[in-house]
Amino acid sequence: MRLSVFYIFITRLAMTKNATKNEMGSKSPNIVALVLPLLLILYTLSSQVEVVESTGRKLAFWGNPIVWTPHSNSCGGSPASVFASSKWTTGRPCRRSRPPGTNIPVSDQSP
């Protein structure tokens, strides 16, 4: 809210200076009147950007590629955590280990 009021004030001030110069006979455009509002808009937009953390998949650019991904509903699908983990054993392909804290019985899961 404060930035929008400041933007209106700067725009009005620049327009007043530009009109005053035109009355005095100067035909050159005021560069500050054009650049300053654009810089203010750019600053306002860049301040609205926030860092959002992922809650579903935990990805990393360094270290281990993928810490955990949810399992696939199909029996033949292999999540990426299987390829990143060295503890995966061949056995029943439809039952995979769950991450800690998700102790849901297999019979209650929907297909």
Curated annotation (Swiss-Prot):
Sequence segments annotated as region (Disordered): 89-111
Q: Which stretch carries the motif SxS motif essential for MIK2 binding?
A: 72-74
The UniProt GO MF terms for this protein read: LRR domain binding; receptor serine/threonine kinase binding
| Tissue specificity note | Mostly expressed in leaves, and, to a lower extent, in roots, stems, siliques, seeds and flowers.
Any GO BP annotation: response to jasmonic acid
Has UniProt tagged this entry with the keyword Signal? Answer: yes
Q: Where would you find this protein in the cell?
A: Cell membrane; Secreted, Extracellular space, Apoplast
Question: Chief subcellular site?
Answer: membrane
Q: Where does the record locate the signal sequence feature?
A: 1-46
Q: Which residues form a coiled coil?
A: none
Name the family the entry cites.
Answer: Belongs to the serine rich endogenous peptide (SCOOP) phytocytokine family.
Binding partners and assembly = Interacts with MIK2 (via extracellular leucine-rich repeat domain); this interaction triggers the formation of complex between MIK2 and the BAK1/SERK3 and SERK4 coreceptors, and subsequent BAK1 activation by phosphorylation.
| Function as written in the Swiss-Prot or TrEMBL entry | Brassicaceae-specific phytocytokine (plant endogenous peptide released into the apoplast) perceived by MIK2 in a BAK1/SERK3 and SERK4 coreceptors-dependent manner, that modulates various physiological and antimicrobial processes including growth prevention and reactive oxygen species (ROS) response regulation.
Protein's recorded name: Secreted transmembrane peptide 5
Organism (species): Arabidopsis thaliana (Mouse-ear cress)
Recall the taxonomic lineage recorded for the source organism: Eukaryota, Viridiplantae, Streptophyta, Embryophyta, Tracheophyta
Q: Which gene encodes it?
A: STMP5
